[in-house]
């Protein structure tokens, strides 16, 4: 019997009058502090039960109720549990009414609804039970279920019959036989609401309002109802016999997520198909720094548990936290195809793929500025407005909705082109530094402006106004202000100022440069590791269509870097989706002229092999027969979204969507008048008579497919036939369209050995190069002449005009003149063929020949055959662009000859009007468009064509059955004129074209016909403009596509066989198999082909989505929370590929226990060392971006084993095949192999079956392409700067050879090695600095009867921090210390000065290398004071008694309190513990054995308080005689010649007087211990140069090493291993290496650096927070700072740079400054930069961080273990006391370099980061204002200038004598030796 219920009512639900949650009377659920619901008999829940076994009234009442709802009773008994025939209570109570008991649920109390229990009658696989909830103590999932004893290793022995479960149920409640591990599901019972009309519903009906939509429970969002996916599935745990048989208990979080209500019935179903309950994909959201090893461990800890959408999971006691976003299961349809479907819950298995998305990533938003940015979209909104009013607000709103905390950087980037005359203008004014040339020889500059830099905000909407303002100003800043600032600086005249430059088009943009600039700082993402964020997201917002013309080498380099980092890029295009595949990168590459023939074996049939042209370098290949070709790449690392939102037009499926636009035509205004109809040219029709019948849908589809075939099947047919196209007649040889980029590259090859004409000089700064396209014009044509005439000067750009060029509609007269000019030019050409030879390269005729493509011609017809009216031809000046769909054209106008070159790549846009320049438009529109408006524009009505003469030998158009346009994205064609080699009598044809208007006088209009020749073609009239050639062959088969690279142009122009050696052929064949390149039709890709292409390069990201989408909708999940690289992949080369493409090697790792094994926990090593080592080796590789290779997801039951690429010897070749469960499955078995891959590396880790070792087989891909770095230069505007600055960067290939020494790493794991140096390890630097705040008052801050000053508290705080770190030192398994404690050697010197203190350096060496300790054989109790003193004075006893400098005083024979306390502990066996040692030390002080050197303190075990032996015991320290003086000053000349130093003046003001002071009096004596020779020059010689005076001053004490001697090396740091998880919350060893300073000055920064390999970063963050909180108590601040100096920031990140702050008034030159500093005991004693240091430390609260390298003595080499060898600090670096800023002191008028401490500014905070950003800006503004005010600087220099020394003042010796006399008077009588303790 359960105890009487005493329910504690919880908060009642809104829908019920009273609570139904009962707390504290039932059985205690596992892991809960709160008892579960009481075991209340439902039938008797309103009554008290007695022992009378009669039928109860409740039984009768409920029996009638059960009959009314037709609920079946239990009629059978189970073999496991006896069941009763009554429902629902045992048949034995006598009932006493209890009105306080809860009511029995009745038919009318079920929320007013009706229970639909019909489904319960169908079978015995379900049952209805009452649901109760309880509150678990912890989330009982994974490692967090039992944090005190986490699972060290996955084990198959973990009781499969009793899995952990959050659901509590009595087995007797289920009407079928059950056992632990069975799969069940909890579902809501459908309750239909009665449809009773009420007044409110009637009112709603009358008003026409829709009823409010009911919000679904969190776990059921985005899950389709009615599909059986909304239940909670779980594995049955252990039986709970104490639970009521009519109840089921679940955690309250589960009930909330699924909408289960307490004490309402739910359906419990049995699941027969267990596979249907397993989750295939689970997506997690997290918001912290989460390593990949932690992701893997979290996934393994969840195996076997149930997760539901919205559930929060944790690892390592809550150190790792994540939330489930969705759960996917593959659901098979009727046709047997598995499709991913969303479910509300699922059970995690080893095969479950985990997807992790970071809500705290570093996000880069690149916004492209180009010509299209300022254009209008179809909806009338400019693209720039779409960014600031559309995309960014929606993105920021979604960020806020998801609760992200990204660190965001927003950058505008642009490329500006310059004409020749503008380059001359820039050259004239010496502004060509950052000019570069593209492939066509066109000059450009790259601009990058940082609008937002590394900011973290709670409300990003507030940043939109500033972003908009910066966007609006960008035009003026780039096109005018940048050069204007340079001109004004040079004093240029007003009339010389011009607006220069032109925006590039979107596809010409520097997008790859932008991506690489973002990747540069990420190359060392493990340095300065931010412990609050994970991942890098790069988003490029562009007004283009996702197509970019790029450089091949830069594309290859970017691809390698993206794959190496395991990253992807998001392109957000603001246009409509184009009619071709995106993203699309076009480039020019060499290629073999024919597919390489490869033979698989002797006599085998030759197979064509095409190398990946992106990785094909002609100069490294043995193929000699090569050519240049246009190539296209679909990068797998780019995800494209199209944000084409029309805000004022809701989406409609039937709305016409424009996919191709001609911006110039739209801006003419003609289309605004609905007075005519635009006539679109007709499709080309074959001569073959077609049946006169209506075309069906299938007919149309067949025609379209045949058309596609004619475009994309050329190369496949060649490969299939295996014959050379050169064997056929020239007329049948199909030519390839050639882009302007291709023409330019060919021109470069032809002119590479020729000297280019340089009319104005010899170098780039004063000469103009000949454009490669001009060389093409002069050398690439046969019939046209080479001579050119000078081009007429182009009109100058308007000066200082910021108005955009006006766009006016062409008048009818102007339109008519176009046709007049066309006809006249053609007539002249017919009469004077030599006119072409004398035409200039930029003339319309030459441009048409070299630039404008001629569209495919129709089949030959006799003139007059066509009933159609002719159409005007294309203008010669317009560059007609062919889009990937040959039926689309766009027109580019308003271009010079070089601007036409940029149109080589396809874009669906036309040329916009000029911006920021009023210049006459030189472009015109297609003739077929003008022809449509002729009835409106012209009085004459010509109905014939106006052809122009062109020497065209195009054989790819209208010449027969072999006519196939080649390019999937054809570009501007090359119209090469070649003489016919075909038939003897070439037949004339007509080529439609229209010349551009001439600037000369226009003659009257006369129609004319020009005849030209074309081999094997004939035409007597002009046909409608053709759009495509007729189909020629079938589509290639899939097998044929496999043999062709998708980067290969699909045309066989000039193809020929190339014979290579067998090894090269084999390598090429393996390459294409491994890389898996496929030919696709980018204008009509099939789903299968797209998947294959993505598999070819994107296998690393295969499991980031359940199914790759083919729709380019906005990928909001990726933009909101970027995905991390998946943990698994399914790519693995076969044996043949591994032999040909990879270098391999093998090594073994022994599995033996080692003493130095700190990366493996001792308990795990003792349990199963090999398993623990294997797990750690996998974890470390996952941390380095490796992925576990598993079987393909769809291959769950492979029919035969997948062939493996590596075979070991027979006795070890066991279990090397892949498993679908990956590493987790192998670790559970404890045998087999784990395969991992990363970029170009593949590793296999194998348990050796017979030996205690792990065999590692590695494979590294061979590099067969060039890996030269790319040098970039441009202009950047960093945040906080004023204007654009010059910048440069290097883009380097990843080091594929062996980026990480994994052999060293594996032997580090097994304890054979302990050095991190050869590895890529994570590191971050912290400093401890004074905060400038008062210490926090708390009990125990001040010792009793002690008065500590502010400096004492700073020392005490540093000591407390070190004591905390000592508690984290790694200990032995038995708990004993394994390492010496961290200690501090206190000093008041600066770092560059303390190295000259010989006694201090000896103390430093003892601390680093260790010292001797006592034998603990003596007892202190009963020993006399003399005996104790004698022990203290013995050498090498652990107590260091030496001369110490402190606050400009020298204390002879002293020791500090910490050393004495430690000596007592180590020497006497009866002194146990710190407290006991402190008591004994205090007793020694009280009895007169020791005293404080200044008698101002009792005994305190602090590092900075010094004590000495009192008289007469001090004489026992024999080598320190009293005659040397008790307090000898640096300035003393006798035993009593010392004085107290005046207050100091710098940040090191508490630093002691410099050693140089002694050097002034006796230089040889000051450096005698250093064995240095001094050069004697009086430092007070009086030179005027303060810097030179300082050097002479330093030379006095900076002795140069002897001839051939070595510098003295001093180690300044101590290194320890920290155990970050002393409470064992994690299931692995969590260790880090700590580097800490030893010598410390409390007024300077104390340095720590942490190094680690793949630890749980949350534990590091916990340690940081603990140290930070402790530091603040004592007036200190624990600050994270960059590892390297801020002056080196631009070397890693070109768009970040320290901000220079110059001094308006240089510091004065004081000849005797060094003498004055000596007189006032200046701490550093260095006159150099004295005034600059004073500005920082005295005026603005900065603290010295690191001193410049050149300030250290020349004869000393200082070594810091956390700095790389050779790393130098150019300038001294300071940190502000708030930690928000870092400053380096340059000196002189150059002043300082300022940089915000991004690690602090961007760190999360409760108040919001905006405050920190504003604080840092305010600090910088204050310093800038002060440094720019010469008057304030002058006053400040006078204030800090030390007064000159005078002889009238009292000497230091006199003051010291008085002080010592007073000391002698206060001395107590010496204690007697018989005094005992």
Swiss-Prot record:
Going by the UniProt record, its keywords in alphabetical order are:
Membrane, Vacuole
Quote the subcellular location field of this record: Vacuole membrane
Membrane topology of this protein? Peripheral membrane protein
Q: Which residues form the DEP domain?
A: 1435-1511
- GO MF terms on file? GTPase activator activity
Q: Where is this region: Disordered?
A: 1-38, 195-214, 746-925, 956-1043, 1528-1548, 1566-1585, 1838-1877
Q: Does the keyword Membrane apply?
A: yes
Q: Name one GO biological process term.
A: negative regulation of TORC1 signaling
**Major localization listed first in the record, in broad terms:** membrane
- Positions with biased composition (Acidic residues): 1851-1868
Query: Ranges of Polar residues compositional bias?
Result: 764-779, 813-841, 1011-1023
Looking up PROSITE patterns in the UniProt record yields: DEP (PS50186)
InterPro entries noted in UniProt: DEP_dom, IML1, IML1_N, WH-like_DNA-bd_sf, WH_DNA-bd_sf
Q: Name one GO cellular component term.
A: GATOR1 complex
Family, according to the entry, reads as follows: Belongs to the IML1 family.
Q: Please identify the protein, giving its name as recorded.
A: Vacuolar membrane-associated protein IML1
Biological source species: Cryptococcus neoformans var. neoformans serotype D (strain JEC21 / ATCC MYA-565)
């Amino acid at each position: 019997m359960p105890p009487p219920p005493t329910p504690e009512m919880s908060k009642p639900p809104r829908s019920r009058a009273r609570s139904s949650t009962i707390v504290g009377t039932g059985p205690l659920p596992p892991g809960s502090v709160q008892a579960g619901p009481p075991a209340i008999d439902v039938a008797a829940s309103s009554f008290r039960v007695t022992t009378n076994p009669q039928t109860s009234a409740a039984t009768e009442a409920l029996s009638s109720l059960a009959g009314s709802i037709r609920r079946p009773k239990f009629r059978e008994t189970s073999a496991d549990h006896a069941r009763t025939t009554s429902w629902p209570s045992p048949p034995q109570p006598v009932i006493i009414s209890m009105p306080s008991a809860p009511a029995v649920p009745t038919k009318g109390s079920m929320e007013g609804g009706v229970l639909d229990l019909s489904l319960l009658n169908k079978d015995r696989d379900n049952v209805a039970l009452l649901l109760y909830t309880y509150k678990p103590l912890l989330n009982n999932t994974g490692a967090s279920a039992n944090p005190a004893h986490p699972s060290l290793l996955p084990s198959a022995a973990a009781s499969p019959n009793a899995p952990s479960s959050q659901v509590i149920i009595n087995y007797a409640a289920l009407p079928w036989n059950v056992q632990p591990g069975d799969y069940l599901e909890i579902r809501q019972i459908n309750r239909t609401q009665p449809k009773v009309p009420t007044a409110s519903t009637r009112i709603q009906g009358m008003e026409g309002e829709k009823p409010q939509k009911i919000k679904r429970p969190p776990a059921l969002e985005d899950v389709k109802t009615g599909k059986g996916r909304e239940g909670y599935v779980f594995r049955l745990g252990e039986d709970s016999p104490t639970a009521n048989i009519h109840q089921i208990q679940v955690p309250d979080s589960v009930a909330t997520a699924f909408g289960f209500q307490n004490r309402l019935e739910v359906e419990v179903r049995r699941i027969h198909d267990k596979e249907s309950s397993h989750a295939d994909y689970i997506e997690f959201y997290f918001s912290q720094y989460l390593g990949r090893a932690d992701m893997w461990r979290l996934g393994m800890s969840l195996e076997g548990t149930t997760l539901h959408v919205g559930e929060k999971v944790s690892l390592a006691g809550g150190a790792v936290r994540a939330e489930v976003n969705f759960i996917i299961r593959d659901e098979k349809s009727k046709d047997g195809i598995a499709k991913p479907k969303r479910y509300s819950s699922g059970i995690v298995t080893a095969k479950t793929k985990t997807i992790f998305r970071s809500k705290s990533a570093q996000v880069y938003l690149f916004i492209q500025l180009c010509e299209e940015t300022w254009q209008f979209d179809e909806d009338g909104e400019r693209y720039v407005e779409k960014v600031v009013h559309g995309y960014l607000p929606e993105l920021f709103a979604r960020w806020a909705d998801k609760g992200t905390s990204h660190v965001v950087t927003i950058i505008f980037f642009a490329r500006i082109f310059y004409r020749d005359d503008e380059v001359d203008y820039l050259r004239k004014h010496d502004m060509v530094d950052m000019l570069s040339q593209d492939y066509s020889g066109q000059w450009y500059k790259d601009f990058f402006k940082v609008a937002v830099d590394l900011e973290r905000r709670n409300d990003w909407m507030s940043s939109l106004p500033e972003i908009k303002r910066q966007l609006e100003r960008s035009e003026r800043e780039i096109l005018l202000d940048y050069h204007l600032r340079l001109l004004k600086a040079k004093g240029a005249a007003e009339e010389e100022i011009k607006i220069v430059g032109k925006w590039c088009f979107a596809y010409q943009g520097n997008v790859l440069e932008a991506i690489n600039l973002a990747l540069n700082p990420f190359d060392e993402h493990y340095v300065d590791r931010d412990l609050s964020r994970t991942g890098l997201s790069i988003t490029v917002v562009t007004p283009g269509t996702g197509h970019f013309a790029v450089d091949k080498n830069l594309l290859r380099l970017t691809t390698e870097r993206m794959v190496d980092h395991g990253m992807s890029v998001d392109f957000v295009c603001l246009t409509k989706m184009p009619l071709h595949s995106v993203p699309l990168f076009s480039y020019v590459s060499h290629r073999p002229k024919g597919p390489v023939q490869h033979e698989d074996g002797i006599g085998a049939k030759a197979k064509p092999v095409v190398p990946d042209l992106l990785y094909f370098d002609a100069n490294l290949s043995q193929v000699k027969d090569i050519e240049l070709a246009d190539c296209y790449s679909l990068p797998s690392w780019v995800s494209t979204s199209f944000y084409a939102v029309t805000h004022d037009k809701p989406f409609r499926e039937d709305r016409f969507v424009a996919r191709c636009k001609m911006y110039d035509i739209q801006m003419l205004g003609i289309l605004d008048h609905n007075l005519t109809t635009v006539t679109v040219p007709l499709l080309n029709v074959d001569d073959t008579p077609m049946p006169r019948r209506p075309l069906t849908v299938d007919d149309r589809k067949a025609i379209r497919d045949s058309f596609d075939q004619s475009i994309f099947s050329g190369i496949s047919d060649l490969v299939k036939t295996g014959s050379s196209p050169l064997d056929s007649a020239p007329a049948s040889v199909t030519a390839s369209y050639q882009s302007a980029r291709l023409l330019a590259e060919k021109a470069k090859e032809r002119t590479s050995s020729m000297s280019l004409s340089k009319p104005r000089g010899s170098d780039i700064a004063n000469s103009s190069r000949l454009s490669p396209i001009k060389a093409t014009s002069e050398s690439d044509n046969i019939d046209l002449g080479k001579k050119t005439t000078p081009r007429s000067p182009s009109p100058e750009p308007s000066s200082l005009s910021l108005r955009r060029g006006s766009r006016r509609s062409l008048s009818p007269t102007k339109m008519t003149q176009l046709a007049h000019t066309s006809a006249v030019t053609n007539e002249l050409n017919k009469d004077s063929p030599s006119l072409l030879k004398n035409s200039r390269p930029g003339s319309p005729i030459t441009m048409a020949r070299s630039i404008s493509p001629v569209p495919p011609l129709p089949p030959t017809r006799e003139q007059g055959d066509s009933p159609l009216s002719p159409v005007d031809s294309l203008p010669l000046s317009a560059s007609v662009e062919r889009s990937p769909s040959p039926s689309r054209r766009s027109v580019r106008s308003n271009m010079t000859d070089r601007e036409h070159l940029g149109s080589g790549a396809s874009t669906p846009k036309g040329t916009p009007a000029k911006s920021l320049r009023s210049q006459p438009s030189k472009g015109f529109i297609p003739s077929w468009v003008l022809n449509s408006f002729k009835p409106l524009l012209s009085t004459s009505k010509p109905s014939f064509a106006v052809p122009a003469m062109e020497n065209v030998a195009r054989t790819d158009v209208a010449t027969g059955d072999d006519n196939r346009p080649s390019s999937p994205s054809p570009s501007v064609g090359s119209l090469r004129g070649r003489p016919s080699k075909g038939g003897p009598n070439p037949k004339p044809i007509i080529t439609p074209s229209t010349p551009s208007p001439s600037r000369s006088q226009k003659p009257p209009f006369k129609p004319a016909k020009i005849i030209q020749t074309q081999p094997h073609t004939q035409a007597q009239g002009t046909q409608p403009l053709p759009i495509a050639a007729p189909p020629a062959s079938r589509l290639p088969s899939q097998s044929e596509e496999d043999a062709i690279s998708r980067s290969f142009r699909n045309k066989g122009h000039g193809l020929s066989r190339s014979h290579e050696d067998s090894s090269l052929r084999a390598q090429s064949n393996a390459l294409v198999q491994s890389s898996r390149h496929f030919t696709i039709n980018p204008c009509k890709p099939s789903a299968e082909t797209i998947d294959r292409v993505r598999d070819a390069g994107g296998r690393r990201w295969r499991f980031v989505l359940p199914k790759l989408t083919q729709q380019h909708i906005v990928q909001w999940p990726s933009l909101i929370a970027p995905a991390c690289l998946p943990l698994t992949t399914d790519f693995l080369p076969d044996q043949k590929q591994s032999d040909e493409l990879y270098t391999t090697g093998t090594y073994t790792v022994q599995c033996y226990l080692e003493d130095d094994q700190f990366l493996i926990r001792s308990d795990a090593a003792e349990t199963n060392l090999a398993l623990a080592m294997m797990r750690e080796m996998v974890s470390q590789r996952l941390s380095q971006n490796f992925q576990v290779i598993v079987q393909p997801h769809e291959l769950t039951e492979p029919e035969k084993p997948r062939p493996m690429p590596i075979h070991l010897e027979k006795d070890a070749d066991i279990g090397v095949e892949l498993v679908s469960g990956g590493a987790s499955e192998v670790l559970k078995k404890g045998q087999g192999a784990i395969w991992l891959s990363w970029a170009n590396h593949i590793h296999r880790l194998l348990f050796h079956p017979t030996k205690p070792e792990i065999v590692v087989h590695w494979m590294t891909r061979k590099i067969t392409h060039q890996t030269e770095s790319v040098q970039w230069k441009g202009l950047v505007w960093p945040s906080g700067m004023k204007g654009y600055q010059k910048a440069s960067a290097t883009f380097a290939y990843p080091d594929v050879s062996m980026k990480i020494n994994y052999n060293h790493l594996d032997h580090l794991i097994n304890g054979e090695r302990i050095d991190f140096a050869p590895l890529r390890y994570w590191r971050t630097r912290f400093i401890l600095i004074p905060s400038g705040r008062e210490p926090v008052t708390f009990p125990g801050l001040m010792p009793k009867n002690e008065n500590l000053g502010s400096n004492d508290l700073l020392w005490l705080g540093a000591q407390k921090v070190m004591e905390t770190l000592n508690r984290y030192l790694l200990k032995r398994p038995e708990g004993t210390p394994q390492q010496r404690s961290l200690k501090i050697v206190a000093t008041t010197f600066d770092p560059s000065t303390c190295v000259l203190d010989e006694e201090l350096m000896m103390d430093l060496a003892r601390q680093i290398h260790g010292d001797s300790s006592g034998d603990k054989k003596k007892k202190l109790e009963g020993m006399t004071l003399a005996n104790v003193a004698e022990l203290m004075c013995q050498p090498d006893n652990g107590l260091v008694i030496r001369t110490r400098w402190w606050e400009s005083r020298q204390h002879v024979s002293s020791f500090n309190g910490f050393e004495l306390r430690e000596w007592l502990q180590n020497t006497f066996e009866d002194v146990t513990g710190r407290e006991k040692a402190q008591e004994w030390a205090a007793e020694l002080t009280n009895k007169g054995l020791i005293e404080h050197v200044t008698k101002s303190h009792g005994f305190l075990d602090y590092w900075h308080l010094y004590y000495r032996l009192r008289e007469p015991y001090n004489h026992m320290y024999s080598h320190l005689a009293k005659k040397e003086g008790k307090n000898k000053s640096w300035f003393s000349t006798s035993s009593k010649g010392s004085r107290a130093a005046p207050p100091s003046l710098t940040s090191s003001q508490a630093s002691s007087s410099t050693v140089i002071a002694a050097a002034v009096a006796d230089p040889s004596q000051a450096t005698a211990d250093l064995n240095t020779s001094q050069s004697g020059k009086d430092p007070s010689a009086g030179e005027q140069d303060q810097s030179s005076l300082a050097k002479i001053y330093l030379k006095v004490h900076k002795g140069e090493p002897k001839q051939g001697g070595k510098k003295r090396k001093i180690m300044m740091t101590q290194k320890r291993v920290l155990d970050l998880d002393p409470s064992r919350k994690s299931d692995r060893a969590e260790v880090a290496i700590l580097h800490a300073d030893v010598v410390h000055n409390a007024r300077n920064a104390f340095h720590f650096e942490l190094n680690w390999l793949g630890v749980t970063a949350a534990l590091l963050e916990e340690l940081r927070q603990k140290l930070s909180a402790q530091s603040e108590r004592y007036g200190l601040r624990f600050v994270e700072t960059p590892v390297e100096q801020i002056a080196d920031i631009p070397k890693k990140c070109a768009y970040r740079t320290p901000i220079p702050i110059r001094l308006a008034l240089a510091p004065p030159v004081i000849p005797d400054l060094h003498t004055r500093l000596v007189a006032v005991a200046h701490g550093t004693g260095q006159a150099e930069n004295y005034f600059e240091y004073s500005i920082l430390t005295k005026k603005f609260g900065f603290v010295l961080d690191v001193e410049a390298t050149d300030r250290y003595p020349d004869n000393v080499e200082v070594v810091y273990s956390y700095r790389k060898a050779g790393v130098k600090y150019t300038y001294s670096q300071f940190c502000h006391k708030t930690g928000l800023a870092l400053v380096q002191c340059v000196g002189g008028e150059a002043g300082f370099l300022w940089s915000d401490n991004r690690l602090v500014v961007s760190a999360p905070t409760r108040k919001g980061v905006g405050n920190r950003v504003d604080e840092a800006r305010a600090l910088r503004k204050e310093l800038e204002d002060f440094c720019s005010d010469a008057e304030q600087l002058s006053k400040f220099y006078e204030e800090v200038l030390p007064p000159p020394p005078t002889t009238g003042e009292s000497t230091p010796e006199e003051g010291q004598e008085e002080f010592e006399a007073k000391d002698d008077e206060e001395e107590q009588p010496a204690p007697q030796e018989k005094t005992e303790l």
